[in-house]
Amino acid sequence: MRLPMNTSLAMLKPSGIRRINALAAQRPGCIALALGEPDFPTPDVISAEVIAALDRGDTHYPPNNGRPALREALSAYMGDAGLTFSADEVILTDGATEALSATFMAMLNPGDEVIIPTPAFGLYESIVVANHAKAVFLDTEPAQFQIDEDALRACVTPATKAIVICTPNNPTGCILNAASLDAVARVAEQAGIYVVCDDVYNRLVYVDGYERFAQRHPELREQTVVIESFSKPWAMTGWRLGWLAAATPVIAEIAKAHQYLVSSAVSFEMDAATRALTVDPTPMLEVYRARRKRVLAALSAMDLDVVEPAGAFYTFPSIKQFGLTSEDFCIKAIKEANVALVPGNCFGTEGHIRLSYCVSDQDLDEGLNRLSTFISTL
């Protein structure tokens, strides 16, 4: 008789986002406003570095944490943004997903708790549970997707090990304001917990005054882990490249998890990664900015309430007025209007849908038209 597999993994469900996209892919002509992936190709100057690396046979094992020159470049790049980490405090990872996995693998013991402000990317909960820890959810909807300090304190227990924040946020596109960041800092300092910053959208910001947690609260660097990615700012989702930074005692433990999870990132992508850091993502940002404006105007015309996103490439409008669950709404939209959106329950917040505007202008406009027509029938 076969023995059971890992019971923690048995509790996990496949990605709801991927499930919706798979359903959409089965329908010819369906427009997917669901997956958070830039619709641009990787800039040629970045891709050229991989071609050159392969031509010269750069296909051997690199250092586990990434080549020193690249880690120096990442350190300088973060320094330009006001985040101070030495090259030895940086690890190149197989995307932000592996960075999160290595971080929580190194950080969590069975029974530990991680606070996850919702709505949130479902990956956080999955990684926490896979490491035999517990996800504790903090509902931010009542505070317009900001952090209420009293509500946060109510989530803290003797078992709390960390809080994970994502700003700009997936799925709302909202940015945590100074009061929210300060609330997290006060609670983290008093409780001694770690702050894991998923900063993968930090180059996709449409407003002035954006601050990152590690930038605003350098006094907590010993408790802070910063995670970044090449995927979103440089349209490199398929490359699976990211990095993380943390103080020396913390990065030393994460490095062990990283080594035994993947050994290293891909050798022949490292020069391309260094080159990417010099490429200005502003042209893509401006396209997203224009699309965001059109999306907000369209949602307003549909009488859908939405907290205006200040970053990333998502909106998270409310659909509570229709009396449908977010899952039912999205399945109905696929079947009746041939447009795919992501249910809010995938992010721990019912009564909303996530609409991504990282698609071609033509598809975006047609998708919005289909959504408008669909809503008029409800």
Task: Give short role names for the model-derived ranges.
Residues N65-G66:
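Short beta-strand to alpha-helix junction loop
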Residues H60-Y61, Y201:
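Intrinsically disordered, tyrosine-centered linear signaling motifs in cytosolic regions
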Residues L70-L74, G95:
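Conserved AMP-binding/adenylate-forming core of the ANL superfamily
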Residues G57-H60, A73-A81:
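Glycine-rich loop-to-alpha-helix module at the N-terminal edge of alpha/beta enzyme cores
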Residues R2-M5, A10-M11, L23-Q26, I31, ...:
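PLP-dependent class I/II
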